[in-house]
């Protein structure tokens, strides 16, 4: 039997995937516009910076020149982290919620490593008594 947290987790996962599908449709629908802007940016001849250019225009030009794989990584990591967090809310054990988020996962791994080192140091301090 699922509890309330698990039900809300599955509803969250469903809504998140639905919103993702809508966002992907929107992105690929405007992909043609992005390609046109990128081609215009490439076809322009290098010019001296004009005095009237604003910082927003120069920022837009620099961001458009970033490669596609970098944009993918920038958006994919937070997307997957949010999805994995929502998915972890569907687990039966409430103690495992959030373990798949990278900072929490690293903290748990480091804590386990420190605990293992402490335990092995305590074992090595024990002396065997030979009878």
UniProtKB/Swiss-Prot annotation:
**GO biological process, alphabetically ordered:** lysosome organization; regulation of vesicle-mediated transport
Q: Where's it found, cell-wise?
A: Golgi apparatus membrane
| SS bond list | none
Topology of this chain in the membrane = Multi-pass membrane protein
Keywords from UniProt, A to Z, are:
Golgi apparatus, Membrane, Transmembrane, Transmembrane helix
Q: Does the keyword Transmembrane apply?
A: yes
Q: Which InterPro entries does the UniProt entry name for this protein?
A: LYSET
User: Where does the source fall among the domains of life?
Assistant: Eukaryota
- Assigned GO CC terms: Golgi apparatus; Golgi membrane
Q: Which Pfam families match?
A: TMEM251
Q: Which residues cross the membrane?
A: 8-28, 66-86
PANTHER family given for it?
LYSOSOMAL ENZYME TRAFFICKING FACTOR, TRANSMEMBRANE PROTEIN 251
What is the purpose of this protein?
Required for mannose-6-phosphate-dependent trafficking of lysosomal enzymes. LYSET bridges GlcNAc-1-phosphate transferase (GNPTAB), to the membrane-bound transcription factor site-1 protease (MBTPS1), thus allowing proteolytic activation of the GNPTAB. GNPTAB is involved in the regulation of M6P-dependent Golgi-to-lysosome trafficking of lysosomal enzymes. LYSET is thus an essential factor for maturation and delivery of lysosomal hydrolases.
Per the record, the similarity remark reads: Belongs to the LYSET family.
Protein name in UniProt: Lysosomal enzyme trafficking factor
Gene name tied to this protein: LYSET
């Amino acid at each position: 039997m699922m509890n309330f947290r698990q039900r809300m987790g599955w509803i969250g996962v469903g809504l998140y995937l639905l919103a993702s599908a809508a966002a992907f449709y929107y992105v690929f629908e405007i992909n043609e516009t992005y390609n046109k802007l990128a081609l215009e940016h490439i076809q322009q001849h290098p010019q001296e910076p004009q005095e009237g250019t604003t910082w927003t225009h120069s920022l837009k030009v620099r961001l458009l020149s970033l490669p596609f794989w970098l944009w993918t990584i920038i958006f994919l990591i937070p997307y997957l982290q949010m999805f994995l967090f929502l998915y972890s809310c569907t687990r039966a054990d409430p103690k495992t919620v959030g373990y798949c988020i990278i900072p929490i996962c690293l903290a748990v791994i480091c804590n386990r490593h420190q605990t293992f080192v402490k335990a092995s140091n305590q074992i090595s301090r024990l002396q065997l008594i030979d009878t």
